[in-house]
């Protein structure tokens, strides 16, 4: 309600009267190339045949997907300067979630400022008609336009703009002199045979009074790279022309992550690695009580100090092979090849997969991650659809290192886990995506960070939990050395890691900042 109220107040009666009397404001003229019939015909043919075309201030390029660049889009420099002034006087709202961080104005559909109104009329009037002729489709009169400000560390990560009704995306830049070193480029991605983004194929540096547009399609993956300039504002008008959506292929489904049962290791491994405090039965009971109240807990100084230091140092060894995890519309970070791990790192990995550790987690959380964990009434209700005649003794077989699925494709009775060793540095992130929501399960997340003693919250790299289809964060886990985070999530709770921004690697830092973590997920 606050944003609507602000918009109403900015259009108060006295101000409206003043604007209505502004008939002297010049009518906006578009780039000459757009007005030429010959150019329109040539662009239409080039777009249809997916070939390159250029004339004057207009260029059509079809790699990695069709996009058009029109420089000096609005013909009057004075008009553009006044448009910029009006836009900067608007009320802006901070927008931040897994995908983006920037400031956005209220909807400009009904704004009365003369230069904003004239630009809107030109875009969704004459230019919409021109664009419809070029594409050979009838674009709807729907007005969909807003203003965005990107400043230092603001970003819009890889996505394809897919939303019912969006046919063509456009951006009109109103920026000061801009270089690629300032960041904020519009990056266009190539795609693989599964219509998934691969890598940046082309970067468009913003420039004053330049319009960029592209058709929203299954391959129109793009991003606004992080703004690196600390004193420039990337101001733009952006929106969509609506029309019949292009046909989309079935969504690609990533292969399911392999889940493994525990490794047969006894409690000796716990005494070797873990702070004795957490092996005390009475303290485990306290932890379980707290965990059952909040479904999350952070256990500080979890590993023995000497073990933690040993693993921290080993994770920096150059022998470890780090593999980039993608695709960029879902994630971007590095994961270690298990075969390349130093001995102590591999031993820590085995600790987290050991039978003894599964039992310890059961004691911490009350979850059935080991057959010795006592059942309770709530858990019995969860399993009331189990095969008739099943007895508690059969679950003892779950201590075996091999999981066997029940007949009829039922979930394996053996608790399982999956995990990886990750490295986080400038540009790393994970995103929420539809497939993750569709495949969500009840699960226990474990995060054990290393090398983040001087990590600051403003750097990013935080693990955020949100309810499905909601932006509000339910829980945030901050990277903290040797602090074991445990979070139990249901099928409606999703997680992402916030983009690690430029502040993490500024030149005033003594070293390029990065941190590591063991990330495991356990299933009952």
What are these model-derived regions, one by one?
Residues 2-524:
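Fe(II)/2-oxoglutarate oxygenase catalytic core
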């Amino acid at each position: 309600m606050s944003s609507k109220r602000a918009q109403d107040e900015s259009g108060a009666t006295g101000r409206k009267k003043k604007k209505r009397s502004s008939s002297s404001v010049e009518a906006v003229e578009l780039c000459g190339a757009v007005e030429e019939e010959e150019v329109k015909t040539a662009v239409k043919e080039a777009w249809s045949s997916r070939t390159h075309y250029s004339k004057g201030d207009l260029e059509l390029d079809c790699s990695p997907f069709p996009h058009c660049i029109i420089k000096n889009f609005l013909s009057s420099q004075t008009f553009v300067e006044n448009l910029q002034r009006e836009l900067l006087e608007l009320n802006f709202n901070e927008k931040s979630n897994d995908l983006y961080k920037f400031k956005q104005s209220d909807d400009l559909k009904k704004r009365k400022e003369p230069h904003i109104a004239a630009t809107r009329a030109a875009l969704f009037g004459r230019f919409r008609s021109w664009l419809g002729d070029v594409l050979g489709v009838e674009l709807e009169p729907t007005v969909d336009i807003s203003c965005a400000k990107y400043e230092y560390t603001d970003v819009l990560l890889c996505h394809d703009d897919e939303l019912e009704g969006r046919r063509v995306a456009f951006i009109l830049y109103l920026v000061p002199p801009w270089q690629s070193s300032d960041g904020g480029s519009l990056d266009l991605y190539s795609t693989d045979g599964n219509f998934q983004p691969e890598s940046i194929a082309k970067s468009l540096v913003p420039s004053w009074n330049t319009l960029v547009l592209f058709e929203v399609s299954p391959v129109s993956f793009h991003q606004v790279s992080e703004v690196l300039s600390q004193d420039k504002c990337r101001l733009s008008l952006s929106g969509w022309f609506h029309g019949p959506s292009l046909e989309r292929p079935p969504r690609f489904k990533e292969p399911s992550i392999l889940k493994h049962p525990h490794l047969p290791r006894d409690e000796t491994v716990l005494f070797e690695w873990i702070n004795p405090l957490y092996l005390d039965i009475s303290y485990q009971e306290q932890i379980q009580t707290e965990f059952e109240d909040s479904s999350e807990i952070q256990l500080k100084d979890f590993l023995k100090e000497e073990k933690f230091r040993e693993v921290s140092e080993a994770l920096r060894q150059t022998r470890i092979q780090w593999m980039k995890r993608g695709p960029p519309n879902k994630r971007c970070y590095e994961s270690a090849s298990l075969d390349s791990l130093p001995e102590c790192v591999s031993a820590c990995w085995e600790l987290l997969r050991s039978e003894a550790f599964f039992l310890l987690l059961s004691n911490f959380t009350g979850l059935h991650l080991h057959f010795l964990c006592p059942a309770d009434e709530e858990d019995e209700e969860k399993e009331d659809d189990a095969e008739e005649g099943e007895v508690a003794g059969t679950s003892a077989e779950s201590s075996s290192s091999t999981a066997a699925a029940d007949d009829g494709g039922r979930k394996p009775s053996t608790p399982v886990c999956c995990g990886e060793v990750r490295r986080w540095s400038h540009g790393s992130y994970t995103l929420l995506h539809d497939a993750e929501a569709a495949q969500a399960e009840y699960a226990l997340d474990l995060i054990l960070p290393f090398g983040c003693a001087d990590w600051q919250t403003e750097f990013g790299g935080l693990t955020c939990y949100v309810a499905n289809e909601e932006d509000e964060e339910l829980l945030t886990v901050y990277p903290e050395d040797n602090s074991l985070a445990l979070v139990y999530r249901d099928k409606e709770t999703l997680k992402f890691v916030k983009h690690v921004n430029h502040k993490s690697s500024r030149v005033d830092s003594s070293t390029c900042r990065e941190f590591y973590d063991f990330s495991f997920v356990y299933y009952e």
